[in-house]
């Protein structure tokens, strides 16, 4: 299931860079570094077989996206970058709590082992609700979607391409 996302991110990143080839005129080196770090974090997230590594890569994606929006974005880029960062970071706290609960119950962060583990039905319900709320911010779903319009409008074209094409999936 992750291979299509790996292919999508490795195809979309160079296309995004090409789309912004003439538009980005200042701090070009840092811009390219941010995109390559972003691509590395996305691929790491999609190939992780450990819940902790998935979480670290999933959250590390925020840093280059914050920089891409905040440095190379539009007029309200700083506001949009901080709103994006804070919303998605706060949504991730609940994900971390759910992952911690899974680790305490199963004794492992290995994703294949977690899929084989039998969680109590009540715990499954709480984990579902916790992950749903967490991903509702990340995806984004109503009513926790208000960061998205600002991030898309203020991000450079390439940042919007990655945001819409990969990260919101």
Residue ranges and their predicted role:
Residues 1-93, 152, 156-157, 166:
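Internal transmembrane alpha-helices of multipass membrane proteins
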Residues 8, 86, 129-136, 163-167:
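Hydrophobic alpha-helical transmembrane segments of multi-pass membrane proteins
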Residues 59, 138, 169:
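Conserved G/P- and acidic residue-centered "switch" motifs that form tight phosphate/ATP-binding loops
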Residues 92-151:
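Juxtamembrane/interfacial segments at transmembrane-helix boundaries in multi-pass membrane proteins
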Residues 144, 157-163:
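Extended, hydrophobic alpha-helical segments in both membrane/secreted and soluble proteins
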């Amino acid at each position: 299931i992750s291979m299509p996302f790996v292919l999508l991110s490795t195809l979309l990143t160079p296309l995004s860079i090409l789309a912004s080839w003439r538009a980005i005129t200042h701090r070009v080196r840092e811009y390219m570094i941010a995109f390559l770090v972003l691509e590395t974090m996305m691929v790491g997230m999609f190939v992780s077989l450990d819940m902790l590594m998935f979480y670290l890569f999933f959250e590390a994606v925020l840093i280059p996206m914050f920089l891409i929006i905040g440095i190379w974005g539009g007029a309200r880029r700083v506001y949009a970058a901080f709103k994006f960062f804070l919303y998605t970071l706060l949504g991730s706290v609940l994900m971390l709590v759910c992952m911690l609960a899974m680790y305490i119950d199963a004794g492992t962060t290995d994703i294949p082992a977690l899929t084989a583990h039998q969680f109590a039905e009540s715990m499954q319900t709480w984990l579902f609700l916790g992950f749903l709320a967490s991903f509702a911010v990340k995806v984004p779903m109503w009513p926790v979607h208000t960061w998205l319009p600002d991030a898309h409008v203020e991000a450079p074209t390439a940042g919007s391409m990655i945001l819409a094409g990969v990260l919101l999936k």
